[in-house]
Amino acid sequence: MMPRLILASTSAYRRQLLSRLQLEFDTGRPEVDEQPQSGEAPSALASRLAAEKAAAVAVRLPGAWVIGSDQVADLDGQALGKPGTRAQAQAQLTAMSGRTVRFHTAVSLIGPERELHALDLTEVQLRALTPAEIERYLDAEPALDCAGSFKCEGLGISLFDAIRSQDPTALVGLPLIALARLLREAGFHLP
């Protein structure tokens, strides 16, 4: 019998991605403070938050394996949060126009007496965007809940010149290649 698997997230995007691995799982809401610590690098922030999310749910469900994931976008080493407002999304997209944005996507798998962690780096080269293009994009797909102010799985892909990544699912928020490796290491049966 396979151990119980929990996704420590309420994100529909992550739930949809995890379902691609064809494992039964439940979800749990992680209650963590997502504020960066002073001087914390974007990759360290993503790794810490992924681990904290998994741990926050694992403590409530002893014996289960819990997946936590987090993504932090950075432009020139400066973390970009979820915009939350249209004005902030406009500002982020304007700042990223014609530039490369790095997305640090971390995943943690916490189970009985064991923790496994991975980190994926994806680089997105945005094309030069006009203010009108930014407005049209935000009218069509206001990605206010997404790091970087776009949804790569939707119309946001039209903002890109290129993506460099070992794992295309990482940009959506859950690096399945790394997660599948961690799950196999933990004893889950995957091809």
From Swiss-Prot:
Its main location: cytoplasm. It comes from the Bacteria. The active site is at D70 (proton acceptor). It is found in: Cytoplasm. Nucleoside triphosphate pyrophosphatase that hydrolyzes 7-methyl-GTP (m(7)GTP). May have a dual role in cell division arrest and in preventing the incorporation of modified nucleotides into cellular nucleic acids. Belongs to the Maf family. YceF subfamily. This is 7-methyl-GTP pyrophosphatase. It comes from Xanthomonas oryzae pv. oryzae (strain KACC10331 / KXO85). The lineage of its organism: Bacteria, Pseudomonadati, Pseudomonadota, Gammaproteobacteria, Lysobacterales.
